[in-house]
Amino acid sequence: MTRRWTMGPEWIAILALVALFVVGTVLPINMGALAYVAAWLVGMYSLGLDEKEILAGISADLVLTLIGVTYLFAIARQNGTVDLIVRTAVASVGGRVALIPWVMFAVTAVITAIGAASPAACAIIGPIALGFAGRYGISPLMMGMFVVHGAQAGGFSPISIYGTITNSVMEDAGLGASHLTIFFSSLAVNTVMAAILFVVLGGRKLMRLRMDADGELVEAGAATGSATAAGGSETRVHPDRSDARSATGATPTTGTPNPGDAGTRLEHTLTLLAFLAVAVVALVFEKNIGFAAITAAVVLSILTPKAYKDTVKQIAWPTVLLVAGVSTYATILTTAGSPEFVGNWAAGLGAAAIGALILCYVGGVVSAFASSTALLPVIIPIAIPLVAEGGLSAGFFVAALAVSSTIVDVSPFSTNGALMLANKPDTIDENTYYKQILGYATIVTLVGPLLVWVALVLPGW
């Protein structure tokens, strides 16, 4: 008698994920809305969950972070405070435009390395970095991804959140911690990816540009005649910003506005103090950055209610829906056992190296839609058979898993990628920027785990 094969819930959840991704890419429908539909149907009719259990999967933390941060920065953009930060930061690099992305990368890396959550660091630095991109003609994709890669570059230090989780899980599994191996692996991979982005997305051109005393872009060029004796010449550059406003509030035709163009000195001071308070509350006292940001925004609105009465409309509501829906469906995936199903299958393969590669891809693909923090404790124990029986180095294998599961946080469906999308410069259309981030995230998800595996696992360190 032939045994009849039935499709398990783990397969149904995986196929539904593929379907909603395809539909959301082909049709102009918010993928968060599609994810809610998929979560409802798969949850009720495949997993037998009721609606309360399905709704319990929504990541309220991520949603509140997006709402609070975009609300606060909408106020800062409206009163000119972000523009003030931009001018100050430009001055700190001596007007050398090419250094701006690397400064943002380094600052974000330091913040996560000393213990900040990756989304918290991206929430604080991302809008400021994208303000630079909108003002000075830097690729928004490069700038946004520099912030995310910076967060991951420092994200596995021994005292960081990711580093603490990863090494603790290794010790609990009897593998022994590999603090420096994991940290420097993540630092190296993300720095290399940032360097590639810098070259591909116009970084070499930025090296010829600087800001003059009036805040305008100038390009150094070879001098002739009497200018040669003076040591060179400069050509003023005019980026095409005729149809958009920058994220910092400058109009395309006015360049860098004067400090008094928007808001007052008191408003700027109060807003800067609000930024500082949010950073201290979130990073030092380890409170939720979403609550901190929305509280700061409400306090500023109470102090000047008429000025900010319409600011709430500038919250990135489409992005909020995107993250809320996808995070809910990610819980359905986990409940269905899809990650464990694929991971256990990979661990059961005969070749340890091939099993390791498959696990790296499982980590990358799942983390592109779900929480990296939640995934790491799940996927690392699955790798134990490959370490015990396959002769793989525990430190480098776990490093490969950790890096593969976090470099994909550039995805617009993850918190970090969504924060970049939510704070896009006004010089780029939201749909265009979404497609750029999605395209880059797709490349990273498809190629990144393979390259990480080749560098860290295949040599058999």
Question: Where on the chain are the PLM-derived regions?
Answer:
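Hydrophobic transmembrane alpha-helices of multi-pass small-molecule transporters
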Residues: 1-65, 73, 199-334, 338, ...
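Structural signature of hydrophobic alpha-helical transmembrane segments
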Residues: 4-13, 59-71, 119-122, 166, ...
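Hydrophobic alpha-helical transmembrane segments
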Residues: 10-15, 33-36, 98-106, 120-124, ...
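Transmembrane alpha-helix interface/packing and boundary motifs in multi-pass membrane proteins
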Residues: 20-29, 107-117, 148-156, 281-285, ...
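Transmembrane helix boundary and interhelical junction motifs in multipass membrane proteins
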Residues: 32-33, 116-129, 143, 157-163, ...
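Membrane-embedded alpha-helical segments and adjacent helix-loop junctions characteristic
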Residues: 49-135, 312-389, 397
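Membrane-core helix-loop-helix motifs of multi-pass transport proteins
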Residues: 132-220, 418-455
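C-terminal transmembrane helix pair
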Residues: 178-195, 354-357, 365-380, 384-461
